[in-house]
Regions:
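Acidic/histidine-rich catalytic cores of soluble enzymes
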Residues: 141-143, 147-208
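Alpha/beta catalytic barrel-like cores
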Residues: 1-88, 97-111, 119, 124-128, ...
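Active-site groove signature of glycoside hydrolases
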Residues: 93-95, 99, 124-143
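Structured loop/turn residues at beta-strand edges in well-structured enzyme cores
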Residues: 38, 132, 184
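Histidine-centered catalytic micro-motifs
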Residues: 89-97, 190-193
Length: 208
């Protein structure tokens, strides 16, 4: 995103244009998905809805009160539409969101990234209760720190983030057994493909 570092006034105007466009497009997408059968009414929203939200050079801009107020104004209709039509929403932060990393600096950046997604969910009206209306922010339990490090990091997240987080088994470092170790603390998502790659075991829909 080189344009974020060029011509500050132009970049800020582009930020306004992009955030407004993305929020409006999300509402239209939900309205389209609302025409599908109930079991298919789900949308995974993209992490890039707000450009550079966690970039060090842009954090102060995004945290300005007028920007935060505007984000809440334009994101609220997304949640309203989803609840009106029974569309389940989710986020899936990228591979660099490693809440169980052994490196403290990576954990700090990962918390910042996860809370960015929690901010968007909060503006949409989610996070007040445990996975309200099926909303989830799903991340892999990746990182060499495993379950113990993840649980320490979990306690540092905002209440809304803890209400919405789900953990998915990873294909490389932390498989199904590791995710089950945190099942008393957080909701789990089972990725059948990742489990097959990690263990060689295939789980079918008919298995007990």
């Amino acid at each position: 995103m080189r344009w974020l570092r060029e011509h500050k006034d132009e970049a800020e105007q582009r930020q306004w244009d992009i955030m407004n466009h993305n929020a409006s497009a999300a509402v239209k997408m939900i309205e389209r998905v609302a025409t599908l059968p109930a079991e298919r009414r789900m949308v995974r929203l993209g992490s890039e809805m707000l450009q550079g939200y966690t970039e060090p050079s842009w954090i102060a801009w995004w945290q300005r009160p007028e920007i935060q107020d505007h984000c809440e104004k334009i994101f609220a209709p997304i949640g309203e539409a989803a609840r009106k039509y029974g569309v389940r929403l989710s986020f899936h932060p990228g591979q660099f969101c490693v809440l169980a990393s052994e490196a403290d600096e990576i954990v700090e950046r990962s918390i910042l990234e996860f809370e960015y997604h929690a901010d968007m969910a909060r503006w949409m009206g989610y996070g007040k209760t445990w996975h309200d209306n099926g909303f989830k922010i799903n991340v892999h339990l990746s990182g060499k720190g495993g379950a113990a490090k993840f649980l320490r990091t979990l306690g540092r997240l905002s209440p809304e983030a803890r209400n919405l987080i789900t953990i998915e088994n990873d294909e490389m470092t932390n498989g199904l057994d590791t995710t089950l170790a945190v099942a008393q603390h957080v909701a789990l998502v089972l990725d059948l493909h990742h489990h097959w790659i990690n263990s060689g075991e295939y789980i079918s829909a008919q298995d007990d």
